[in-house]
A protein has these predicted regions:
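Sequence contexts marking disulfide-bonded cysteines in secreted/extracellular proteins
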Residues: 16, 65-67, 96-98, 149-151, ...
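Sec-dependent bacterial lipoprotein signal peptides
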Residues: 1-13
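A short, solvent-exposed beta-edge/loop patch
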Residues: 126-197
Length: 197
């Protein structure tokens, strides 16, 4: 069960680069007109490399999880704001960032599809609708990762924001986060306060 998560973590790590200097963000017309995104852009980024702008498969919301939070907010989730990877590599349908701690991580990703795509589907058996931060969200686990990963998905404009809590070291990660879905919902409840509707 751990192998798919480890492969994913290694693939993400292999695609990341660290570039010295200040992080930059692209400005789009959608983010410059939306109050929540404008407020998000003012938070100091914990990224260490230039940040890619949204692409066709993930531009349905002006929200950018990679620059939406302060280091203190990220730290309050239990992960290290300095251990961040930008998952928005060229060619991927999703964009977002992953923050890590010893044995586990929190990723946030965006894709242009409705939250309802994650309900009543054989791909995510056992998915459930749940009110999260006042929004109609979905909580699900993938059979491919079993109980080593849990996702809380929230609607934002014409996209879905996924908050994924995953274990990459069973011994240390499971001790730190015994209930992945509870942590995913807890973080997603905070994320909901930042999302443009």
């Amino acid at each position: 069960m751990l192998a798919p998560l480890l492969v994913t973590a290694l693939a993400v790590a292999a695609c990341s680069t660290t570039t010295p200097g200040a992080a930059t963000t692209a400005t789009t017309s959608a983010s410059s007109t939306s109050t929540p995104a404008a407020a998000s852009a003012s938070a100091p980024s914990t990224l260490t490399a230039p940040h890619l702008p949204p692409s066709k498969g993930n531009d349905g919301t002006s929200f950018d999880p990679c620059v939406a939070y302060t280091a203190e907010e990220i730290r309050s989730w239990g992960v290290d704001p300095a251990r961040v990877v930008d998952n928005g590599n060229d060619g991927l349908r999703t964009r977002g960032c992953t923050w890590s701690a010893d044995g586990w991580s929190i990723a946030q990703s965006i894709i242009n599809n409705p939250v309802s795509d994650y309900l009543n589907t054989p791909v995510y058996p056992g998915s459930r609708a749940e009110k999260i931060g006042g929004l109609d969200g979905v909580v699900y686990q993938s059979p491919a990762t079993g109980d080593s990963m849990c996702t809380a998905a929230l609607p934002s404009q014409q996209a879905t924001v996924h908050v994924v809590v995953g274990i990459y070291n069973e011994k240390t990660g499971r001790k730190a986060v015994p209930d992945l879905c509870a942590r995913a919902v807890e973080v997603a409840t905070f994320v909901a306060t930042k999302l443009p509707k």
